[in-house]
Amino acid sequence: MNVKIIDYNAKRKDFEVFHKTGGAGMNYAGFECLNGVFQFALDGVTDITGTPGSGKTEFGLEILFYQSEVFGLRHLLYAPDIGSYNEIRRKLLVKYYRRSFRGYENSITDLDLINATAWIDTYFLIAGKEDAKKPLSPIDLWNFTCEYEDKNGIVNTCFIDSWKNLYHDIQGREDQYLDYVLSYRNELAELKQRHFMTIAHPKNVEFDKDTKKRRIPDANDISGGASWMTGSPRSSVRQ
C-alpha cells in the first residue's frame, strides 16, 4: 500500500523556512500587470491557454527568461510547437538579445551567437525524443526534469509546448485520465520543488456575438474540460 505518515522531524527545516517567508515561496513573474495576481511558485504549476496567435509561447518564455536572469533558475524545454532545435534556439537568441535573428542592420551576428552560447546552454536545455519512433508522455518529461543534474546543477522547470504533442494513455474518459496525470504532476512538483509549465490549446473558441471577436477561452475549452482547472491549484493563465 502506497501510504505513509509524514514525520515532522524530516520536514522541520522546510517548515521553518516556510514560516519565515510567510508561506509564500514564490518569485515575481516579471510582469508588473500581474503583480499580486500571478507569481512563479518554485514548487508549483502553470497552465497557459489562449486563442490561436495570442502569444502563449512568448508569454511563457518571457516568464522563464526573467526567472533565469533574476533568480538563476534553469529550464527544460520540450517545444515541438515552436519547431525544430534550430528554430527553438533562434527564438531563445532573439529573446536574449531583443534583436532580429537576421536580415537587418542590427541583426544578431556570428560573434553574438558565440557570446550567448554559454548563458543559453546553462539556463535553457532543449529536449527531444531519444527515439523518434517511441512515444513520450508528460510523466516521462516531469520525471526526467526531477532526475536530471549536470555540472551546473538541477533543472528547476519543465516547459511543455504543447500538451497535444505528447503521448497520452487515456484508455477511457479523458477527464479521468487528466485527474490522474495532473494530480501526479502537482504532487511531484511539491515533493521535488520543481515548476511544471504547460501550454494547452483550446478545442475551439466561438466568436462572441456582440464583440465579433473570439471569446477568451477558459479551462472548460481545453480537451478534458474542468479537470484542467481543478488540476492546476497554483496558477492558470488564459489569454
What do these predicted ranges mean?
Residues I126-A127, D175-Q176, G224:
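Acidic, glycine-rich A-domain
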Residues N2-R98:
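The Walker A/P-loop phosphate-binding site
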